[in-house]
Amino acid sequence: MFIEKFRVESPNVKYGDGEIESVYSYETTELVHEVRNGSYQWVVKPKSVQYQFKTDTRVPRLGVMLVGWGGNNGSTLTAGVIANREGISWVTKEKVQQANYFGSLTQSSSIRVGSFNGEEIYAPFKSLLPMVNPDEIVFGGWDISDMNLADAMGRAKVLDIDLQKQLRPYMESMVPLPGIYNPDFIAANQGSRANNVIKGPKKQQVQRIIDDIREFKEREKVEKVVVLWTANTERYSDLVVGLNDTMENLLAAVERDEAEISPSSLYALACIMEGVPFVNGSPQNTFVPGLIEMAIKRNSLIGGDDFKSGQTKMKSVLVDFLVGAGIKPTSIVSYNHLGNNDGMNLSAPQTFRSKEISKSNVVDDMVSSNGILYEPGEHPDHVIVIKYVPYVGDSKRAMDEYTSEIFMGGKSTIILHNTCEDSLLAAPIILDLVLLAELSTRIQLKAEGESKFHSFHPVASILSYLSKAPLVPPGTPVVNALSKQRAMLENILRACVGLAPENNMILEYK
């Protein structure tokens, strides 16, 4: 059974004027390696820590500024939100299609809230806590191309023509602000699009981004802004002592107009200085150590890296299943081809390398979790190929071969073929990232023994479910397994309304 909304009644939760307060007992374990009976033993000790959560339920008017607004992802997301807001339907060769938010965790997935008369009861994910209605988001942003959003939508060739015609009047007046352009960080083939760029030294570029955010916020009368990078994949930045290793050195490097500071890092720097959440949707190392240090010191939310949309999402499910079933993946070969601008940019070796790193690390935590299957340091062979094929456009093709060792020396091979519209997978993920980033800024918590409430760590690991290479606070384990990431996110939001984690034990029926 599906219910639209619910209210929690419990001594552990209190609904007040503009906020929800909850008390939550976090059940975890503590491991110690100690001498017992003359030898070292591992001892696991159950541990309970009481937390208090406080969530501001006043939902703000939200502005979203996209870096790369005129690209396939930015134009597709903007078009999709307008189509939903206006209730637009359009004719395809198969049917009359209604606008929807399919593919969005927050808008189109559900959570289990209990059982009633022997039937499982589910509710929308978004019913857990008050979230921004995506129909009410105000969009803006930057792009190195000055093409308006209606023409950019046509250039992307993602949405049906009938829908494009209906959306054009809404999008023709939407024109991106000039963006930061450094040809050294992206493929040379992007130069033909770069007719809308911010001139001047890096310090001046950062100030221009700050001014743009302030002017957008004032002009559109929005209470909060979230900035998200959905522009070209950049090459990796060199990590250099004295350049970007500390906050102080990074700021000094900007003053000197050092070449080895990427455009994405400049956008992130501007957002941190302005106290605006910044999410990186591409695989490059935007968050150099100096930026992370600065975000932590200023308590300004940063998240990323790289949208987890198609092939990698499947991989983080399948490898988790195989290793969890006691099957040993020994070879993973992933091949992709696509024909959109992302594919063209990735045809350059230096930008492909960023994507290769992002895709390659996705199985690491699953492999290291099973010392029965893998010796220390052992890892499956993992090869990734991406090719640019202009004819297929946004229709990305992904082929994967998983070879595993099974019982008594046997072999198992699984082959997957996945065809999808790349931007139609990415757009709802962008939506989820900005909605959850905004929501997380309204949640505060404190553990027993702490005197004051505080926000989540500014390095927003809560966004891991949506990222190929999750950014986590220093010293925090990286989790890539999709089911664990979703459970983490859902259970944190459940804790905010005093609900226990969903553990699927269903003991009442055992």
From Swiss-Prot:
Organism field: Spirodela polyrhiza (Giant duckweed)
GO biological process annotation, one example: inositol biosynthetic process
Upper classification of the organism: Eukaryota, Viridiplantae, Streptophyta, Embryophyta, Tracheophyta
InterPro entries recorded: Myo-inos-1-P_Synthase, Myo-inos-1-P_Synthase_GAPDH, NAD(P)-bd_dom_sf
Protein name in UniProt: Inositol-3-phosphate synthase
Top-level taxon of origin: Eukaryota
GO cellular component: cytosol; nucleus
Enzyme Commission code(s) on record: 5.5.1.4
Cofactor or coenzyme needed: NAD(+)
